Amino acid sequence: MSSSDCPSPLPTAPKLQVDSVTFPPSVISPASSNTLFLGGAGVRGLEIQGKFVIFTVIGVYLDPVSVPSLSVKWEGKTTEELTESVPFFREIVIGAFEKFIKVTMKLPLTGQQYSEKVTENCVAIWKSLGIYTDSEAKAVERFLEVFKDETFPPGASILFALSPEGSLTVAFSKDDSIPETGKAVIENKLLAEAVLESIIGKNRVSPGARLRVAERLAQLMKENKVEEDATKTDQEEANDLSLAKEN
């Protein structure tokens, strides 16, 4: 299922500013040209010699169809319940809707540094699940190759678009702009899922992004329920009126 197969209205999601990096309310995916809404954003950093050092700031965008899709099981849960729920974030990761990730640099990184750390996290996830195969090993090689000659100064961004079918589109930007097309497409569903899993999943590198996604989706699912109830009431009233006329 994609937004073109099952169009949903774009949720009202205000922009977020995280450590001087602004994430707009919506973006157009370089993989599909679909408009996705901002699910949440947060920093990735480490405690170094008693000081928290921020390396990157990460924004996560979702297809609007994710809201009714997730509402089936998770509507009514609080932000706290969703934040602590591994199955909820797993459902976002594997859900049949498009996702987009924007990773903006706060400190300079080389493509090699970034890609080696990401693939290290991905391989750890696969091995813990017992699903690391030759196909994934080849996808990792391709991922490392795409990043090999890249450098990312502060303010530059790495962009990932995850299709419902499982492809991972990789793009780069030296500023806040998002290119219309990606630099490379890697056809490996597990790699695409693992990139997002490493950010907001069980062993996430950005607890802040995970919290914001839970917070925003809890509110959007609540609003979705109100809209569904209103539509249902309108339909029932219309049916009652129709029956009254027939009688």
UniProtKB/Swiss-Prot annotation:
- Write out the residues that bind substrate: T56, N121, S198
Question: PANTHER family this protein is in?
Answer: CHALCONE--FLAVANONE ISOMERASE 1-RELATED (PTHR28039:SF8), CHALCONE--FLAVONONE ISOMERASE 1-RELATED (PTHR28039)
State the Gene Ontology BP annotations. Answer: flavonoid biosynthetic process
Lineage at the top is:
Eukaryota, Viridiplantae, Streptophyta, Embryophyta, Tracheophyta
Superkingdom in the source lineage? Eukaryota
Pathway note? Secondary metabolite biosynthesis; flavonoid biosynthesis
Record Pfam families: Chalcone
Which keywords belong to this entry? Flavonoid biosynthesis, Isomerase
Q: What is its EC number?
A: 5.5.1.6
SUPFAM superfamilies in alphabetical order: Chalcone isomerase
Question: Which regions are flagged for Basic and acidic residues bias?
Answer: 223-235
| A GO term, aspect molecular function | chalcone isomerase activity
Its protein name is Chalcone--flavanone isomerase
Instruction: Give the coiled coil ranges.
Output: none
Which InterPro entries does the protein's record reference? CFI (IPR044164), Chalcone_isomerase (IPR016087), Chalcone_isomerase_3-sand (IPR016088), Chalcone_isomerase_bundle_sf (IPR016089), Chalcone_isomerase_sf (IPR036298)
Origin species, per record, is: Raphanus sativus (Radish)
